[in-house]
């Protein structure tokens, strides 16, 4: 293992149990899947989050669930990345995306927040948008006048929850490809 090859994978969400199963917690759900598959306990408390570390296919990996609430996610991610000296391009963010249908993935090497307050916070705290992200489709509001907060904080219907669960293996494969320097391949295989 290359000792400089360390990655931070952060799943975004809100920490209270009342938010379990909500659209905004798609990142938490995906991170829980990775932690289970990779045998990494995400139970240490520091950096305003729950975190754990392990090794995945020769890469040192730190998994993080910020406990700052979505809009302040950067307040957890930036200090942890700084502590472990993880550069921004080795920070993979898992988050919800209301512009994609439930279960669809949008993989990007960098870019704007696209209206996502969690990503805005991370961009501000890391000092730029040069970090990869796996955006997980949770579906658009049912009508334009529907309150966005009510939508993203609403529970997934069973079929949408299944669509997310069905894509978790693809999220895992995408994270591994990104860590292997093959983000373009991940995009061609798993976007959509």
Per-segment meaning from a language model:
Residues 114-118:
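Hydrophobic alpha-helical segments within soluble ligand-binding/sensing domains
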Residues 1-110, 120-134, 141-147, 154, ...:
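Nucleotide and nucleotide-moiety/phosphate-recognizing core
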